[in-house]
Amino acid sequence: MIKIENLTKSYRTPTGRHYVFKNLNIIFPKGYNIALIGQNGAGKSTLLRIIGGIDRPDSGNIITEHKISWPVGLAGGFQGSLTGRENVKFVARLYAKRDELNERVDFVEEFSELGKYFDMPIKTYSSGMRSRLAFGLSMAFKFDYYLIDEITAVGDAKFKKKCSDIFDKIREKSHLIMVSHSERALKEYCDVAIYLNKEGQGKFYKNVTEAIADYKKDL
């Protein structure tokens, strides 16, 4: 279970403070792959970043005993002057045991299919290459929950198939919390849904299709 307790997140703007959400309370139940649904600006991606420890709330708490990934495929944290291999090694030292480090690096190298670019500076990469490296890095470590934000759109048809296959493998032992504009992806990968509604609160649905229907009514 992941419990979101009185979570508030805001940003300062020229016209005043903008609240992404205020005193948000949600329970992500244990044992499910969960679709996170909401209109643009509802705070779906922001919430994933907070749950994954990439962003900080103004106030409130994330309560869980589970090991949670950063948002899968997040490429913004790479150091551009370092090579792909060097970036991967840096992260692997934080998340892998010493005797597993080389195995994790080899996995990312094979999965990302970057060839010689794996040993070239990240600043020479295209956005697609960064995304493939970031996705492979996210998949190299074991988490109880993987946070997925539109990552199913990454790469060509072959790479998308590889992503789909590894999602299926992950779901055998772990779970997903997924944000996607693709109804097909949400229905395929998720069992239940949480809808961030117009009132700024999360409503739980046992059926993803019903959550999508209510979301469409509010458009």
Curated annotation (Swiss-Prot):
The entry's keywords: ATP-binding, Cell inner membrane, Cell membrane, Membrane, Nucleotide-binding, Transport
GO cellular component: plasma membrane
Name of the protein described by the UniProt record: Polysialic acid transport ATP-binding protein KpsT
SMART domains the record matches: AAA (SM00382)
Listed transmembrane segments: none
Any GO molecular function: ABC-type transporter activity
Residues in ABC transporter domain copies: 2-218
Taxonomic superkingdom: Bacteria
Locations listed in the record: Cell inner membrane
Entry annotated with the keyword Cell membrane: yes
Family matches, as InterPro entries: AAA+_ATPase, ABC_transporter-like_ATP-bd, ABC_transporter-like_CS, ABC_transpr_TagH-like, Bact_Polysacc_Export_ATP-bd, P-loop_NTPase
Protein family membership: Belongs to the ABC transporter superfamily.
Chief place of localization: membrane
Binding residue positions for ATP: G38, Q39, N40, G41, A42, G43, K44, S45
Biological classification of the source: Bacteria, Pseudomonadati, Pseudomonadota, Gammaproteobacteria, Enterobacterales
Organism: Escherichia coli
PROSITE patterns: ABC_TRANSPORTER_1 (PS00211), ABC_TRANSPORTER_2 (PS50893)
Membrane topology: Peripheral membrane protein
N-terminal signal peptide: none
Entry function: Putative ATP-binding protein, and an energy coupling component for the transport of polysialic acid across the cytoplasmic membrane.
Record Pfam families: ABC_tran
Disulfide pattern: none
